[in-house]
A protein has these predicted regions:
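Flexible glycine-rich surface loops and low-complexity tracts that mediate binding to linear polymers
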Residues: 67-80, 165-178
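Hydrophobic beta-strand-centered segment that forms part of the acyl-chain substrate-binding groove
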Residues: 89-93, 149-150, 173
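Short, structured interface segments
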Residues: 68, 72-101
Length: 238
């Protein structure tokens, strides 16, 4: 196993389980289950995030709705056929459960490569944002494709990045509801999952970005990524 790839993608979340575990798949005789967890923001709002957990962890910790968990893992993607079309699915793959929470209940750091041209735009409230899709290498020659959103001056910086450039980011995972119109009478409310970036580094700077150090630092500061959509934390790594 490539331990360097294991460091490219680190997540910590702390929250309340909302749903019963549902069987997802089996690998070498070990079953994996899906559930959702609500992670509270400082504002009181919550991000409802999908988790994938092994049956061993579920049995050891008696994971069920209402239980609070502190989970370390990775943010992973996979393709799923939905109505005959391939859809990118995202989940927090839990590697370890901790007894104690961290001050920051929602913390992610990633290192990967730009795989689509960033899309820069201004919202109706005059906020600058940029959508970025990052390919993060995983062991066994796999990759996870993680949608991210940058704000303010990070968004302006992101729009200058090219496909193939290396990038490192830190922030939080957020859920966001949106409406999609399939026909005049068919409008559905869907949920998107993405990384809200509070810090980013690109090109040579990304090579010197210590994932472990940044992950520990982000977890030690309460609410560090809460205001990622403002200018307060829009700084790049040096």
């Amino acid at each position: 196993m490539n331990t360097l790839n294991e460091k490219n993608n680190k997540v910590f979340i702390s929250g309340e389980i909302l749903t019963e575990a549902e069987f997802s798949h089996e690998v070498y005789g070990e079953g994996f289950y899906e559930m959702t967890v609500m992670v509270k923001r400082l504002s009181g709002q919550g991000d409802i995030l999908p988790l994938t957990v092994s049956e061993r962890l579920i049995e050891d910790r008696n994971l069920k709705p209402g239980v609070f968990i502190n989970a370390l893992g990775q943010f992973r993607s996979y393709n799923k056929l939905v109505d005959g079309k391939s859809k990118l699915m995202l989940t927090v793959f839990v590697r370890e459960l901790l007894d104690e929470p961290r001050k920051n209940p929602n913390n992610i750091v990633l290192s990967g490569y730009i795989c689509k041209p960033p899309v820069y735009r201004t919202t109706p409230f005059n906020r600058e944002i940029a959508d970025i899709l990052i390919a993060v290498n995983r062991s066994y020659n796999k990759s996870d494709y993680i949608p991210c959103i940058a704000w303010g001056r990070n968004a302006r910086f992101a729009k200058t990045l090219s496909v193939g450039e290396k990038i490192a980011v830190a922030g939080r995972i957020q859920s966001r509801e949106y409406q999609k119109k399939f026909s005049e009478d068919d409008i559905k409310t869907l949920t998107a999952y993405e990384v809200s970036i509070s810090k980013l580094a690109a090109a040579d700077n990304a090579d010197y970005f210590d994932i472990d150090e940044e992950f520990d630092m982000m977890g030690a500061v309460s609410g560090r990524t809460e205001d990622a959509d403002g200018e307060r934390y829009q700084n790049k790594f040096n």
